[in-house]
Amino acid sequence: MSTSSNVERISGELEEWIGRSRDAAAEALSELISIPSVQANPVSVRPGENFPYGQAVQDAFAYMLSLGREAGFRTCDMDHRAGHIEFGEGEETVGVLAHLDVVPAGDGWQFDPFTAGISPEGMIRGRGAQDDKGPLMAVFFAMKGLKEIGFRPARKIRLILGLDEETSGDGLKYYLKRAGMPDLGFTPDSEFPVIHGEKGILEFSLAKKLRRSGRKGLDLRKLSGGDAVNVVPGSARALVNSPQPSRYDAVCEKARRFSEKSGFPLQTRRSGKSLEIRAEGLAAHGSVPEKGRNAISILLAFLGELSFVNEDVNEFIRFYNEYIGFSTDGSGLDCAFRDSRSGALTFNVGMLHYDREAVGVDCDIRYPVTCRGEQIYEAMMPVLDRFGMGLVKREEEPPLWFEPDDPLVESLMEIYREETGDREALPLVSGGGTYARDCPGTVAFGALFPGDEDRMHMRDEQITEERYLQLIRIYGKALIRLAGERQDPRDAQKARDVQNT
């Protein structure tokens, strides 16, 4: 790793370069944000080849690889699943793992989530500005600046481009098996100063099978909510039908009173022969459900005041309201684990599904670093069994832990302190899941600064241009420190000659 004096000298040159390149850096990020890279169905290109995450994700990937080639970097496209932009020589590699895919935009934005561009006030706006296109582009411009000022890293610097981080993360695993692991590095996909621990992640579904009902009365025709399991849902919707449409007036009045009493907005409107009921919440990252307002919980709380012809539907709604509801710590399902290292478990319901066969929810748990996933499931099962609820395990990511005095953690902490002047900051444990779990020797480093508004997975995501430029500086310093400077053989000989005189 480079010494502090080397970091200071090269950082000064980089600072001047950033000042000259600020407009280009902002425009490149705005262009990347304009590509709506939400994962979609695979797109066939030719026999035996496809874009596994859809056209838009591939477009964002192609854009970054094009920028890399234009800057004179080596690039790699690993079967359209992941890739990298790289410069420098050396046997070892510093890896920076970032991702180009984004979660769905959702509703309620004050500006277009993909085409808002840069505001007159200097805000770079749109989905991905914080998570993770802004940090990714900041690392790219740090690399570009270092190359253009003549920095020669002793280790290769590799910006690894993930394409499905928000869903399975399988693309990165595919890439790492073929390209190999970097020796050390970081991912700019969390918050500052440094994340030395990440809670474990469980994704699973809870569902109840539905029997046919021959009764007549208020029928639940449709029920849905949420776009992704790792997002607090911002909206949810039900469609109900009655053989006596006059009953809709009573339902609408109940909805009005519910909203007035609870403070949760509900909207009702006639839709053909049915009545639509829509709940509005506040989206947030699924790892911090307490920062959002769950629209699924709002909708089911209201539907609990109605009685449907299918008693299994009524029982599911009662189960949800009593054992999940608005709680975000899993206490209703007897899984409110916590520890001194990482704090409390968090519980998010991200999606709601319904058809004539079953009704269910997709859930996301972030559990303490000293727990095991099976402990969580074992704790929940007695409650689930009592209500005839089925559980389907989807994904599990075990916790990540580095000691606070680990050399990598300490090096990145020092970079952060030098840049910000914050000598009181300490390494953190996060509920978020990052690529650091898949890549030993890496931790999350930024990109959200303490005190800044966290808009990740939320509407109106944006970053100030000044913060973005600061990210370029801080990541540039981190790359200088971690990669080290390759010594010119002639300089080494001069140093030996001086020592011998």
Identify the function of each model-found stretch:
Residues 2-127, 148-153:
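Acidic/His- and Gly-rich active-site-bordering loop/insert found
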Residues 30, 65, 137-144, 173, ...:
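Predominant activation on well-ordered alpha-helical scaffold segments within soluble catalytic domains
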Residues 87, 208-210, 240-244, 279-281, ...:
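Short beta-strand-to-loop capping motifs
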Residues 93-161, 167, 183, 458-459, ...:
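Active-site metal-coordination/substrate-binding segment of hydrolases
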Residues 103-119, 207-214, 269-279, 414:
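Acidic-glycine-rich active-site phosphate/pyrophosphate-binding loop
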Residues 132-211, 252, 256, 328-341:
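Acidic/histidine-rich catalytic neighborhood of metal-dependent amide-processing enzymes
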Residues 205, 211, 215-216, 231-243, ...:
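A short core secondary-structure module
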Residues 278-283, 287-356, 362, 366-378, ...:
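An extended, acidic, His-containing surface patch that forms the Zn2+-binding/catalytic region
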